[in-house]
Structures are given as C-alpha cells and as structure tokens.
C-alpha cells in the first residue's frame, strides 16, 4: 500500500471530516426537536458550538473506519499539483521557446532544420544519460527529419562542470568533431572530468592550448549559467530531462516513449493527441 504524506493531507482531512462531524451531529438530533425547529419561526437560536474533543473524536473514528479516504485525498492532491506544474511548464516553454529550441550556442544532432525537435538536458556523469544516449542515436538514425538539441547541464559536481567546460570549448572550436567527442565522453566508463574530457578532445585532433584558452572565455560560464536558469524556470532539477512540444519529460523513458511524443507533436502539435 502506498505511504501517506500526512503533512499534505492532514489539513484537508481535518476540514472534510470536521464538516462530516458537524453534519452528523445535527442529523442525530431527535425528530421532535427538528420538527420544532422547522415550525418555530419566532425564535432563531444559534446552534450549539461543537466541542473540539467531539470533532477530533469524530475525525478519528471516521478515518479508522474509512482509511482508504486518505489515499484518495492524497492522490487527488498530487494530481492537482502535477496539473498545476504541467501548466506552469507549458507557459515557461512558450515564453522561452527560442532559448529552448533555437539557441545558436547549443550543440545539435540530426537535422538542424528538422520538422520536430527534442531538447535534452544532460550531465556527462549521469548514468541514466549514458543509458539514454542510445535512444538519441536510434531516433536520429530512424528519423531524418528530427532535430536533437543538447543542453549542457552539469549538476553532478565539479568534475561534471569541468568536463562540460571542455565540451563547450571543443564544440566552439571543432563543431564537426563534436558529435564524436560527445558520444565518446558520454559513453566513457570512468568519471567525466577535465582530464578525461581533454584526453578525448586531443585524441580527436583538438589543440589543448586553444581549448583551454576558449574555456577561459566568460561566455562559456555564462552559457552554463543560462542553462541553469532555464532549467529552473522549466522546473527541471535532474537529468536526463527533455522538452518535446509543450511538455517537459523527466527521466530515461526509452526511445519508444520519446518517439511517440515526437509523432504526436507532428500530428496535432502536442505530445498527447
């Protein structure tokens, strides 16, 4: 059975069950008293205040007899919160459409003029991102009209940040070799770092002095900070995360799930038709 989040649902339960107790109290009054109340119009008396202990007892009794109500309340609250989050994310996507889909600073795989776009926020040290790399490759190979944008989003410590600085500098200097660099570093068994990223960069023909000079350019750090800000606005806090159409998709959900969402965007403009 799912665990209950009492901090979320206790206030709701108190209000709901309190109302039930209030109604139950008056429903239990003798029929004669109810009849008298209905026929007596001259005197209007306020109903007696319910004792707090009575309310608490009624709530406790109801919850013990109907514990499934708490799961229903929790599910309803979570669904309401998710709906609000999706609405906020859709608005953020609309407001930041150019920065998300068409930033000239971002590496792009596939067809730069494709009819549909997938945007991925990733970290080179993210295990699920490594697993999801095959999904990207499969989708691009099977869909010549797909544009795949990569958002360098180092969130897993200083090693990740250093590796992404190397990656962005390499992309700026050697854009033709960047796809090989990306696949090799993301597929690397060890930890991505300045050292491992630079080793791959030089093996692909990059000049370390030029790369380090480019890494020192303030624009590299500014681009990463801009990605952090964009992720925050979209409610993205983990990797991998995707933006497809008007939806933020979190987690390595697999090629078939992503491809279905792309197909729906082409068909009706939304990930769900």
Residue ranges and their predicted role:
Residues 49-53, 64, 116, 127-130, ...:
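Soluble non-cytosolic domains of exported or imported proteins
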Residues 119, 124, 130-208, 212, ...:
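Structural alpha/beta surface segment adjacent to cysteine/selenocysteine redox centers
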């Amino acid at each position: 059975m799912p665990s209950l989040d009492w901090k979320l649902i206790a206030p709701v339960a108190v209000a709901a069950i309190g109302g039930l107790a209030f109604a139950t109290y008056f429903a239990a009054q003798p029929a004669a008293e109810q009849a008298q109340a209905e026929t007596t119009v001259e005197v209007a008396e306020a109903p007696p205040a319910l004792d707090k202990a009575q309310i608490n007892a009624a709530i406790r009794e109801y919850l013990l007899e109907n514990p499934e109500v708490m799961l229903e309340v929790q599910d309803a609250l979570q669904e309401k919160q998710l709906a609000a989050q999706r609405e906020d994310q859709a608005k953020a996507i609309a407001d930041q459409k150019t920065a998300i889909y068409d930033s000239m600073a971002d590496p792009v795989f596939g067809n730069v003029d494709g009819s549909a776009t997938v945007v991925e926020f990733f970290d080179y040290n993210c295990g699920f991102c490594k697993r999801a790399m095959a999904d990207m490759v499969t989708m691009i190979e099977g869909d010549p009209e797909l544009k795949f944008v990569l958002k360098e989003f180092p969130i897993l410590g200083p090693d990740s940040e250093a590796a992404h600085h190397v990656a962005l500098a390499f992309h700026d200097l050697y854009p033709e070799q960047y796809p090989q660099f990306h696949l090799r570093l993301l597929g690397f068994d060890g930890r991505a770092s300045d050292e491992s990223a630079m080793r791959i960069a030089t093996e692909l023909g990059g000049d370390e002095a030029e790369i380090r000079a480019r890494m020192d350019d303030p624009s590299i750090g500014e681009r990463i900070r801009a990605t952090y800000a964009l992720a925050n606005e979209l409610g993205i806090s983990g990797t991998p995360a995707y933006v497809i159409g008007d939806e933020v998709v979190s987690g390595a959900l697999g090629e078939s799930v992503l491809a279905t969402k792309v197909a729906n965007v082409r068909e009706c403009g939304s990930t769900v038709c």
